[in-house]
Amino acid sequence: MREFLIPGILSEGGAAASAGNPSAVAGLQPVNPADVPGWDALVMAHARGSLFHSTAWAKTLQGAYGLRPVYFLTGQPDGRSALLPLMEVNSWITGRRGIALPYTDECEPLYSDPASIQRLLQAALEYGRSRGWKSVEWRGGRELFEGAPPSLAFYTHSVALEADEERVFARLESSVRRAIRKAEKSGVTVTISQSLAAMKVFYKLQCQTRRKHGLPPQPFAFFKNIFEHILTRNLGMIAIASHQQRPIAASVYFQMGARAVYKYGASDEAFQHLRGANVVMWEAIKWHARNGAKTLHLGRTSLGNEGLRRFKLGWGATEQKIEYVKYDLRHNRYVTETDETTGWYNRVFNILPMGLSRLIGAVLYRHCA
């Protein structure tokens, strides 16, 4: 981990100055979005608002992992607002820290007035110091930290949706179109569901997929919370591909307003030749477009994962790069990190019994965030 000292609002001098001037952020206290009437309406009033800013996602993270919501909000006389989502992760393994947001690829601050969001950033830092946080990590809003080095960087991809399915299909790479047609000709069918039973089907495939990638699966409690707080509110769905009544691929999608998100995907490697994952994505694209979505976000991709990057680009996606920013509150410095998606542990989880892998995942994910 490398450290950088950057002049500005989060610099060593800035930290000292704000500590001696608490009135700079007087009256700004963190809130739980579930306790704020009309929170989701505030989120949707912002062009960049997404489900990850919503009460549903906050309840999901709090319910699954016991995280503490510490969101900051300020309003303006003209009705404009600035919103800064944060969660406190309190771990005896990795320490106490703030993340915007855990288990989330991107969740940028929402604002129209730069002065307002800077005030919220300062309030969050002072709150973090009062709580003994080691650090604060922002997964979005890179423009607010000019001159700061990124702690991590990833690719992101988004697909433009429209009602004309033929036009969308024509934008797909030829290999993707062939895969979809092959799945359809092979008798692969796709069902859309918001049920707990469908989530259990997905989770079984998810455990297989995580083993293939050499990673422990997330605890089922997390996906049960997604069902309880998101799917039951019609804010998402599960698409399941089956062949001869056997599930071979499944994915979890979210949608709030015009923004849809591909959040999790899983498949049975033994049936990869049937291209279930491709037809699942295609049916999800059509479903979200019919339900008013204008974009489908495909999540983050590690810079070194060329295979996943090619898969996402094959859907006619627009590629961008997202940079996270992490600030060490103990030393008043920005820090850089290494993407640790791959490592020696992948070989271990490739061979561990599934029961043991699930147990490890249930313990570790609460601390890793």
Walk through the language-model features, giving the residues of each.
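Short intrinsically disordered coil segments
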Residues: 101, 170-179, 338-344
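A conserved beta-strand-loop-helix scaffold within acyl/acetyltransferase catalytic domains
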Residues: 3-4, 8, 20-77, 84-95, ...
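Active-site/acyl-donor-binding loops of N-acyltransferases
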Residues: 2-23, 71, 88, 142-167, ...
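Short clusters of hydrophobic/aromatic residues that line enzyme substrate/ligand-binding pockets
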Residues: 109, 172, 325
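A gly/proline- and charged-residue-enriched helix-loop-helix capping module
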Residues: 99-140
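Aromatic (often tryptophan-rich) hydrophobic motifs at membrane interfaces
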Residues: 72-84, 89, 104, 116-127, ...
